[in-house]
């Protein structure tokens, strides 16, 4: 912000600047459609059985802050979906709560974008899918909508037959 202010003064356009806000900076924009939360060791911390609950909560809060910042910058209220029973679900619940709180405040960052009011169309809202990194998304993307290619890869299907060992293994 200091560089921006210095450049504005040097260029003589500082009189045109009405307001600069230092908020919603919980992410780093790398490209038009790519951003980074710049969180180190997040995966290790969230999957370490010895991790303190306070550290896990702090990590989840950091992820939520970054995602909220990105949504607020875009001015869009996403439809949030996550897998159940893990860090992704905890992030989804906290993010949903933070967005609801912001929507109930005056001057919220989503006033120009989609609203989360009853009767609003979810078609016009972006979809935010949260997955745990342990979730194997590639199998779903690489295989057709039928189970045959998946069965062929996983269960060694030969001549349209599959032998399944049921001896408890």
Which residues make up each language-model segment?
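Extended, well-folded catalytic/binding cores that form a central cleft or groove in large enzyme
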Residues: 1-169
């Amino acid at each position: 912000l200091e560089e921006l202010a210095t450049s504005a003064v040097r260029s003589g356009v500082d009189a045109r600047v009405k307001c600069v806000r230092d908020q919603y900076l919980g992410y780093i924009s790398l490209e038009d459609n790519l951003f980074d939360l710049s969180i180190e060791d997040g995966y290790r911390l969230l999957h370490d059985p010895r991790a303190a609950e306070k550290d896990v909560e702090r990590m989840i809060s950091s992820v939520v802050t970054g995602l909220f910042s990105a949504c607020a910058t875009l001015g869009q209220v996403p439809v949030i979906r996550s897998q159940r029973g893990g860090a992704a679900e905890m992030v989804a619940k906290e993010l949903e709560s933070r967005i609801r709180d912001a929507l109930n405040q005056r001057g919220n960052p989503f006033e120009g974008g989609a609203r989360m009011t009853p009767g609003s169309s979810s078609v016009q809202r972006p979809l935010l899918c949260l997955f745990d990194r342990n979730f194997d998304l590639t199998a779903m993307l690489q295989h057709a909508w039928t189970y045959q290619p998946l069965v062929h890869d996983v269960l060694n299907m030969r001549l349209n037959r599959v032998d399944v060992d049921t001896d408890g293994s």
